[in-house]
Swiss-Prot record:
KW Nucleotide-binding (keyword) present: no
Domain notes: Has the structural arrangement of two alpha-helices stabilized by disulfide bonds (CSalpha/alpha 2(S-S)).
Compartment annotation: Secreted
Record flagged with keyword Signal: yes
Site note Aromatic residue of the functional dyad, residues: F44
Top-level taxon of origin: Eukaryota
Full protein name: Potassium channel toxin kappa-KTx 1.4
InterPro entries: Toxin_25
Length: 62
């Protein structure tokens, strides 16, 4: 029983860094997506301020 608890404890200690890395990686991916959306919106906003219509802005900004 004692060796089983030791094995489980070691397994948990090995998995914690992997889960931590996955969490940090997921947050950075979310940040990149937010940046892409913000940049795209900025493009549309600038396009509209320049007096272009929606169709032209969509072709220019993607």
């Amino acid at each position: 029983m004692k060796s089983c608890l030791i094995n489980v404890s070691l397994l948990i200690l090995l998995l914690l860094p992997i889960l931590g890395y996955a969490s940090v990686n997921a947050e950075s991916i979310d940040g990149e997506n937010d940046f892409e959306e913000e940049r795209g919106f900025g493009c549309f906003r600038s396009c509209w301020k320049a007096g272009h219509d929606d169709k032209t802005c969509k072709s220019m900004c993607g």
